[in-house]
């Protein structure tokens, strides 16, 4: 249910950016106040990403006020901060559906609105995309603007600097807005810097600077260089932009990101300039809601809550898989001082908070730098250290070349704890872990395991840790069936060996990972065999052969793309071994699955208990003759 717009009279007058641009500028601060309040109370009812959006209210207003969107292109990085943008671009009444099945996406999505110029979800892509748009406009002789809005976290990734290096070299007409919510500005330096930014971004200074450059070009090179260095030195005393200037960008800032009047003035000036330029905006995550300002991590992504009371206390229940990993990590680190853990900016999400507190000297958060994280692990492994890299399935895609070239090719003992495997839920297709079995299974030297419950996850993590080669354990988001952890047991399991969980007749279900549990429930009803395969590479070929010899049909079940996944490996083995038994595959379809709850999405793709029973019953009914 959406918040009533009747309580927000000024916001009600702004259904879209075109209406926004008709407002007098002096009304923008009041509009920002209403927009922030509307956002807070909407997300409190629906759940979603909160702190980032609260911190980007004034910036979003100023960008849409100054630029002629959607003709001018705004490209948001990651997209957590896009909720104010969605409210202002005709989707206000549907905000209550955000991240819900069939509702608005939690990130910018091209199919959803012409104002969403580029689909995002992963970090640090905005500058590359906006640069492409800027170069396309230049090639077509069009005057539209391209603006990338990127956070200080997104700036830690190499792709951002690769794009800036290219933009500077190409002299592209590109504005990058750096939304810095980690930096604080001291009062005096901040005031001086903002005053200087207004001067430097103004038309008078821009015209003077362009004219002086033309004059300096006619002077001897030493004089030209002296003038350039003098300007850099004077700006550098109050402006921290030397790095960006070296990449070919004009730097402006820092500017108070919550002063909408100043933002409109500076952005208005920059809109009339050309070439690569960067505006450094300083904001506060969670701005305007004290609990979110004090704990932006807790309020990054929230469920439903009462803004007057704050977030509800978490209730007990089964451990989430990331908590299982966190406990295992601490237990193994206590036993083995060689263990070193790595995360690419996902300490909380990967369950590593306690480990980081207890073992800070053996913990590396490398920032949003998945490529570096993988090769860092490879370098550690070369020196007899035992690296454990905790990484989401969807983000491991970003370090794939390093996994192949730097880890697997050298057969280095790196343990990949692959979190968020399968359908993750509300974050949708940018974050589903749909492909890891497919892209890992084809890599020589890789061992891949998929646990069916918490206890098996614990045992397989230990197995991978003790293995002398690259090893991936993939597990889902959220809780498992509630299996007790074997916390005193850190010994390995036999690699490449599954276990038959139930003996039935006619159909043998070869289940991988979390789908073992619903497969067992269906097998009880239909009297089928179920094997918990545990390993995707190497497969338990002896078990597959035995089941092929004693059943009329084999069915593989996995929460991964069917194409190239575990089931494909089973079919390859059957063909290689000359085993003439029919086989069917159940897994994720050949399309990007949208957002919703995991239960809704599993039902959509036929991998919930009801869907499995439908498929298995249908195949059972078509089998000819008696069982073997």
From Swiss-Prot:
Its EC number is 2.2.1.7. Thiamine diphosphate binds at residues 80, 121-123, 153-154, 181, 289, 370. Pathway: Metabolic intermediate biosynthesis; 1-deoxy-D-xylulose 5-phosphate biosynthesis; 1-deoxy-D-xylulose 5-phosphate from D-glyceraldehyde 3-phosphate and pyruvate: step 1/1. Pfam families: DXP_synthase_N (PF13292), Transket_pyr (PF02779), Transketolase_C (PF02780). Mg(2+) binds at residues 152, 181. GO terms for cellular component: cytosol. It comes from the Bacteria. Binds 1 Mg(2+) ion per subunit. One of its GO terms (molecular function) is 1-deoxy-D-xylulose-5-phosphate synthase activity. It catalyses: D-glyceraldehyde 3-phosphate + pyruvate + H(+) = 1-deoxy-D-xylulose 5-phosphate + CO2. Its cofactor is Mg(2+); thiamine diphosphate. SUPFAM superfamilies: Thiamin diphosphate-binding fold (THDP-binding), TK C-terminal domain-like. GO terms for biological process: 1-deoxy-D-xylulose 5-phosphate biosynthetic process; isopentenyl diphosphate biosynthetic process, methylerythritol 4-phosphate pathway; terpenoid biosynthetic process; thiamine biosynthetic process. Keywords: Isoprene biosynthesis, Magnesium, Metal-binding, Thiamine biosynthesis, Thiamine pyrophosphate, Transferase. HAMAP family: DXP_synth. PANTHER family: 1-D-DEOXYXYLULOSE 5-PHOSPHATE SYNTHASE-RELATED, 1-DEOXY-D-XYLULOSE-5-PHOSPHATE SYNTHASE, CHLOROPLASTIC. Belongs to the transketolase family. DXPS subfamily. Catalyzes the acyloin condensation reaction between C atoms 2 and 3 of pyruvate and glyceraldehyde 3-phosphate to yield 1-deoxy-D-xylulose-5-phosphate (DXP). Homodimer. This is 1-deoxy-D-xylulose-5-phosphate synthase. It comes from Alkalilimnicola ehrlichii (strain ATCC BAA-1101 / DSM 17681 / MLHE-1). The lineage of its organism: Bacteria, Pseudomonadati, Pseudomonadota, Gammaproteobacteria, Chromatiales.
